Curated annotation (Swiss-Prot):
It is found in: Cytoplasm. The gene is rocD. It catalyses: a 2-oxocarboxylate + L-ornithine = L-glutamate 5-semialdehyde + an L-alpha-amino acid. Pathway: Amino-acid biosynthesis; L-proline biosynthesis; L-glutamate 5-semialdehyde from L-ornithine: step 1/1. This is Ornithine aminotransferase. Its main location: cytoplasm.
């Protein structure tokens, strides 16, 4: 590590709030699946900014759309119409089959917006008594870090000393349809769930789980809200992760890859029954739906489809999953994944996953640990077979080491 990097990290430590603990690398450039640090070292990005850079770093077509729009008009607020919002609505609706769109910025904003919307639907359409609406969520969830969201987290570090929290949430085990059935009451307005729990360690529910969930929600007039902010837009080898079981959510949340890493853009996708309950002045965002965001998102969606990134995620994800499972390492407890959303869970006695991520950095791989003993792997969807094979070589030599 050069003296300039040491000085840079010292400045961050001195002046920045310590709410993150990054790997000790300072990145300055990216292209496709690759990023470079300030010392000129190249790394294969196996995090993709938590799946926000699915289309690859600095995709030229998205960049061109952003630059062109930035020269024309960037922000109007929603006090006025802009010429990019309606085309954005048309294109995201056509891509996903949605009937109504609420544009926001961050993923957490989309989650908060969905919570407000389904509660309002519960009171005005379903007939739940005022202030009695209940939303069911899952243990080990991660939907964001705003106050409303961390209130129904089960992670002590995420929610500790941030209360008091808003009422109205019931927590059940993830992947347990029987628990959902038992938790539903006449006041239940929604079940908010991730198709795959990413932050928890890429936890995939049992086959058939979401088919049963869909049946239960339909039978009990409960809105199924799928948080596809990480899983959506091709990450799992399908446009939406819900498609693996052939179901359709009532409310779908998108973000991250919706703008290809260039801009914070998120969206709540639903129907008129839910989003039609919102009236002027009841919800909004100065930046949500701005012309720059819409132009960038339109380009990001186009390249995802036109360049076959979703199909590539399925193909390369299968190659990567098989290769990781073939690694014979006593340190590895389980390998799991769907598409290009994967995880290697280590035996506790193998040592902390962060140490393995630091070793991978030394071999030109950037990956992220989560929950102590799990390495998350989520490269951009543009990764090639040769790049997958090279990455597997680095994982093989690293995972066979003992950092206990």
């Amino acid at each position: 590590m050069s003296s300039s990097v040491i000085d840079y990290l010292a400045t961050e430590t001195r002046l920045g709030a310590h709410n993150y603990e990054p790997i000790g690398v300072v990145l300055s450039r990216g292209e496709g699946v690759w990023v470079w640090d300030t010392d000129g070292n190249r790394y294969l990005d196996c995090l993709s900014a938590y799946s926000a850079v699915s289309q690859g770093h600095c995709h030229p077509k998205i960049l061109a759309a952003m630059v062109e729009q930035a020269h024309r008009l960037t922000l109007t607020s929603r006090a006025f119409h802009n010429d990019q919002l309606a085309p954005f609505y048309e294109e995201i609706a056509a891509l996903t089959g949605s009937h109504k769109v609420l544009p926001m910025n961050s993923g957490a904003e989309a989650v908060e917006s969905a919570i407000k919307s389904v509660r309002k639907w519960g009171y005005e359409v379903k007939g739940v008594p005022d202030d009695q609406a209940e939303i069911i969520v899952c243990a080990d969830n991660f939907h964001g870090r705003t106050l409303g969201i961390v209130g129904f987290s089960t992670d002590p570090e995420t929610r500790g000393h941030f209360g008091p929290f808003a009422p109205g949430f019931r927590i059940i085990p993830f992947g347990d349809a029987a628990a959902l059935e038992q938790a539903i009451t006449p006041n239940t307005v929604a079940f908010l769930v991730e198709p795959i729990q990413g932050e928890a360690g890429v936890i995939i529910p049992p086959a058939g789980y979401f088919t049963k969930v869909r049946e239960l929600c339909t039978a009990n007039n409960v809105m199924l809200v799928l948080d596809e902010i990480q899983t959506g837009l091709g990450r799992t080898g399908k446009l939406l992760a819900e498609q693996h079981e052939g179901i359709e959510a009532d409310v779908t949340l998108l973000g991250k890859a919706l703008a290809g890493g260039f801009y914070p853009v998120s969206a709540v996708l639903s129907n008129n029954e839910v989003l039609g309950t919102l009236r002027p002045g009841q919800h909004g965002s100065t930046f949500g739906g701005n012309p720059l965001a819409c132009a960038v998102a339109r380009a990001a969606m186009r390249v995802l489809v036109e360049e076959g990134m979703i199909e590539n995620a399925a193909r390369q994800g299968a190659r990567l999953l098989e290769g990781l499972k073939d690694i014979r390492a006593n340190t590895v407890r389980e390998v799991r994944g769907r598409g290009l959303m994967l995880a290697v869970e280590l035996h506790p006695e193998a040592g902390r996953a962060r140490r393995y991520c630091e070793a991978l950095q030394g071999k030109g791989i950037l990956a992220k640990d989560t929950h102590g003993h799990t390495i998350r792997i989520a490269p951009p969807l543009v990764i090639t077979s040769d790049e997958v094979d090279w990455a597997l070589e680095q994982f093989a030599t690293t995972l066979t080491q003992d950092f206990s």
